[in-house]
Regions:
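N-terminal Rossmann NAD(P)H-binding glycine-rich loop of SDR-like oxidoreductase domains
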Residues: 7-27
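C-terminal substrate-binding subdomain of Rossmann-fold SDR/epimerase-dehydratase oxidoreductases
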Residues: 23-26, 52, 203-331
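Rossmann-fold cofactor-recognition segment
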Residues: 44-57
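NAD(P)H-binding glycine-rich loop region in Rossmannoid oxidoreductase-like domains
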Residues: 54-94, 104-107
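Short-chain dehydrogenase/reductase
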Residues: 91, 95, 145-157, 187-195, ...
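Conserved Rossmann-fold NAD(P)-dependent oxidoreductase catalytic core, especially the SDR/UDP-sugar
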Residues: 99-146
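Flexible, glycine-rich beta-alpha linker
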Residues: 121-123, 172-194, 221
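Active-site Tyr-X1-5-Lys
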Residues: 144-172, 196-206
Length: 331
C-alpha cells in the first residue's frame, strides 16, 4: 500500500510526530515533516523536513502541496501544568493551525487527512470520580471539556467532519489517551505525568534525596499508552474505512501514586511521596476500547510496566547529565 504514497506529518519535531515519521518510513512511505523546530533528541529521517509556522496560511499551503495524505499532529500543548495556565494561547494557536492546515489540504487536493484529537474532549462531569467509567466515543456529548485545549480539539473534530461532508476529503479522527515513551519532553513544564514521574524518581535516585513531589493526593486516575502502540494505531486508523472519532489508548487505569511506585520499582529505588498543591486535571479518566477493537481488530499491547522500563533509563541518563552539570565547579 505505501508504494508511491506521499504523506505529511505536521508536528514532526515533537514527541509523537517524530516517532510517527520513523514508523511511516519503516513502512515505505515518502514522508515530509513540518514543525516549528527540529526534533530535540535525534535527527528526523523524513525525506524532507521544513521549519514552518503552521499558524500562517501560506505556510500550510506550502506544507501540504503535492501530497496524498496528511497526519495532523502540530499543536501548542503540554502536560496539566501547562494547559491549565495557557488557555488563551492554546485556543488561539491551535485553532489557527488546524483551520489553516485542513483548508490548505483541501485546496491542494489531499485525499486523506488524519486529525489527532485528545481524551481532553470528554466532559468534566463524566470524570469526577477516580473510579471512572471508561469513556466511550459518544460520551463527548453533551460537551463540557475541562479546559481550552479540550474545547479546541472538539471544535476541530467537528471541522473535520464538515469538511468531509461538504468537500469530500476523507478525514480520520483519533483521540489520544496519555501517550508516553522515550524522546519526549521530560522537563520544563510541558511534560506529561509519566515523563515527569520518571524525572522526579531519577533525581531522587541520583541525588540520594528520596522525596518525590506529587500534585494533589495522588489518587487521581489515568490510563497510559506507550508510543510504539500509538503510532501503530494511528497508521491502522488512516488505512481503515472509518471516519468517526476513535479512542486510542490503554484501558488499564492506575492512580498517580501507583504510577510513582511503578517508576520507583523500575529504577530500583525507595521513594518518599510528598503531596503538594498543584493542578490535577479531572479526577479520573480511562479509555473504553470496545470500538477500537471493532474497527481495527487491534488494541494496544505494550503494558505500562514494559513501557516504563523502556522509558525510564533514557530519562535517567538525561537527568544524570543535568545533575552532573549542576555539580561541576565553576571557574
Amino acid at each position: 500500500m505505501p508504494a508511491g504514497i506521499k504523506v505529511l506529518v505536521t508536528g514532526a519535531g515533537g514527541f509523537i510526530g517524530h516517532h510517527l515519521v520513523t514508523h511511516l518510513k519503516g513502512l515505505g512511505y515518502w514522508v515530509r515533516g513540518v514543525d516549528l523546530k527540529a526534533p530535540e533528541f535525534s535527527p528526523s529521517i523524513a525525506d524532507e523536513f521544513a521549519i514552518l509556522d503552521l499558524r500562517r496560511w501560506e505556510n500550510c499551503l506550502e506544507a501540504t502541496r503535492g501530497l496524498d495524505e496528511v497526519y495532523s499532529l502540530a499543536a501548542d500543548m503540554g502536560g496539566m501544568g501547562f494547559i491549565s495556565n495557557h488557555h488563551a494561547a492554546i485556543l488561539h494557536n491551535n485553532s489557527l493551525i488546524n483551520l489553516h492546515t485542513l483548508d490548505a489540504a483541501r485546496e491542494n487536493g489531499v485525499r486523506r487527512y488524519l486529525y489527532t484529537s485528545s481524551a481532553c474532549v470528554y466532559p468534566e462531569y463524566r470524570q469526577l470520580d477516580a473510579n471512572v467509567t471508561p469513556l466511550k466515543e459518544q460520551d463527548a456529548y453533551p460537551a463540557q471539556p475541562q479546559d481550552a485545549y479540550g474545547w479546541e480539539k472538539l471544535v476541530s473534530e467537528r471541522l473535520c467532519t464538515h469538511y468531509r461532508e461538504d468537500y469530500g476529503i476523507e478525514t480520520r479522527i483519533v483521540r489520544f489517551h496519555n501517550i508516553f515513551g522515550p524522546h519526549g519532553t521530560w522537563d520544563g513544564g510541558r511534560e506529561k505525568a509519566p515523563a515527569a514521574m520518571c524525572r522526579k524518581v531519577a533525581a531522587a535516585k541520583l541525588t540520594g534525596n528520596p522525596v518525590v513531589e506529587i500534585w494533589g493526593d495522588g489518587e487521581q486516575t489515568r490510563s497510559f499508552c506507550f508510543i510504539d502502540d500509538c503510532v501503530e494505531g494511528i497508521h491502522k486508523l488512516m488505512r481503515a474505512d472509518f471516519h468517526e472519532p476513535l479512542n486510542l489508548g490503554q484501558d488499564r487505569m492506575v492512580t498517580i501514586n501507583q504510577l510513582a511506585d511503578m517508576v520507583a520499582a523500575v529504577a530500583g529505588v525507595a521513594i518518599v511521596k510528598k503531596h503538594i498543591p498543584g493542578p490535577m486535571g479531572v479526577r479520573g479518566r480511562n479509555s473504553d476500547n470496545t470500538l477500537l477493537r471493532q474497527v481495527l481488530g487491534w488494541e494496544p499491547r505494550i503494558s505500562l510496566e514494559e513501557g516504563l522500563a523502556r522509558t525510564y533509563p533514557w530519562i535517567e541518563t538525561l537527568v544524570g547529565e543535568k545533575v552532573l552539570a549542576a555539580s561541576a565547579p565553576t571557574r
